[in-house]
């Protein structure tokens, strides 16, 4: 970058100089972002799970929400069955199937599985609106959110909820997304599970580095959010298409903290 500053600008041609300065400004910005990225991830926190109270009667109630719109029932069933298998007191876990597609087959499946089914007559604000609509009926102390193609492991809640006892100002616990099938690039290049993908960088290092600075954020799925904190910010943010990051910013703005637990406690489709 020093060479660019000292040896590449044409000071005698105004047009070339203007174009060169604009390009140099962009390169300087990229260089600063790179340095900040290295600093941000230099000390990943590697936060361990926190222990729950010994008596399960003291554990909080959880609403686990699975939003869906046009996905096949065969995909959604796997997520529901995995949620039903969570190691958590049955009287403290309510599973919600949030069907923005309003499909009879989904309603029948939810009834057979013994879980709650919610459908909206309107579909404003997409996934965020779907979740906010269900929150009006939910009463749990915590809200766990899973995309309909994400499967929690049996220990998911026991691995995440303990941090809400350790940190009273904790607003959200996020976990990484691990994928059991290849994305299009990995499939076409035949690199699946032979080399890390961009998700491994983000969920394996960037988020863990963010956690060191209390800056990890909600990624839309595979997370647990404190209900009182969610109510305080008016529910899931609906003003942007990145409602997960926007929701995180609102939580942090009100003084809530976030946590990131780098453990394989669910798997996902790409």
Report the location of each language-model feature:
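A conserved acidic beta->alpha catalytic loop
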Residues: 99-106, 122-123
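Short beta-strand/loop segment that forms part of the nucleotide-sugar
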Residues: 91-101, 118
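N-terminal membrane-anchoring/stem segments of glycan-assembly enzymes
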Residues: 1-58
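The conserved acidic donor/metal-binding loop of glycosyltransferases
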Residues: 147-151
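Cell-envelope/extracellular polymer assembly enzymes that use nucleotide-activated donors
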Residues: 61-63, 94, 246
């Amino acid at each position: 970058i020093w060479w660019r500053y000292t040896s590449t600008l044409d000071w005698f041609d105004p047009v070339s100089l203007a174009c060169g300065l604009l390009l140099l400004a962009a390169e300087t910005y990229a260089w600063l972002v790179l340095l900040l990225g290295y600093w941000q991830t230099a000390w990943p926190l590697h936060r361990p799970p926190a222990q729950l109270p010994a008596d399960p009667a003291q554990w909080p109630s959880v609403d686990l929400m699975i939003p869906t719109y046009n996905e096949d029932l065969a995909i959604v069933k796997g997520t529901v069955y995995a949620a039903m298998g969570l190691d958590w007191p049955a009287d403290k876990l309510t599973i919600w199937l949030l069907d923005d597609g309003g499909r009879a087959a989904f309603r029948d499946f939810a009834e057979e599985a013994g879980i709650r089914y919610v459908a909206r007559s309107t579909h404003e604000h997409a996934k965020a609106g779907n979740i906010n609509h269900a929150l009006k009926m939910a009463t749990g102390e915590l809200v766990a959110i899973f995309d309909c193609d994400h499967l929690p492991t049996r220990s998911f809640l026991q691995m995440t909820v303990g941090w809400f006892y350790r940190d009273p100002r904790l607003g959200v616990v996020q976990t990484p997304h691990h994928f059991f099938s290849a994305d299009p690039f990995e499939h076409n290049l035949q690199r699946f599970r032979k080399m890390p993908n961009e998700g491994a960088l983000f969920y394996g290092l960037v988020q863990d580095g963010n956690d060191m600075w209390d800056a990890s954020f909600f990624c839309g799925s595979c997370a647990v959010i404190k209900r009182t904190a969610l109510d305080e910010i008016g529910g899931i943010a609906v003003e942007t298409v990145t409602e997960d990051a926007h929701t995180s910013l609102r939580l942090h703005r009100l003084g809530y903290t976030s946590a990131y637990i780098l453990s394989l406690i669910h798997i996902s489709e790409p």
